[in-house]
Amino acid sequence: MSLDLVQKFGLTKQQYNLLIHFEELIFDWNKKINLISRKDINNFKTNHIAHSLSTSFYFKFKSDTKVLDLGTGGGLPGIPMAIIFPHVDFHLIDKVRKKITVVADIAKKLKLKNVKTDWINVNDLNRRYDFVISRSVASYHKIFNQCKNIFLSENKNEFENGFILYKGGDISDEFKGVAKYHTYELF
């Protein structure tokens, strides 16, 4: 992790050290199980950590906000977000057992008390959340249909409870017909 990322995101020394440790754990685990594309692993800081932290430019979550990381894979964006938002509860889920086993191990080694992990399909959840975050897991319409009834009724943050989806490329067709959404340019 470079100094410019530390400055860009206003990381504390502890947050910086946790992100470095996270990166090391991902690199170690990635030798055994494909969490991050082998072609992309050398760009982990920019393409994965910085991308995950970019939410902090736009959202300042209040204490006890509940966030579901749908299809967390290698713990992205949930683990980096849990590091910079220690007052927020993150629930990281994935349908792939070996991935969620790794993510649970990483969260334990990082001592992230605000992270819960589960090997579960979103349709089997019986909890409610303020936000659902997801990084390139599925189309908006598929995520919407799976999660539309998962939100808490009371809004406690500046933004209305809902989805925070990390998308790339031209998303105009994907969001055609969606009444209300916001887009943010990252880097």
Task: Locate predicted features.
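Class I SAM-dependent transferase core
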Residues: M1-L68, K98-V115
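Residue-level recognition of conserved structural "scaffold" positions that shape functional pockets
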Residues: F59, G78-P80, F175
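Conserved S-adenosyl-L-methionine
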Residues: D69-G73
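S-adenosylmethionine
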Residues: H87, H91, K95-F187
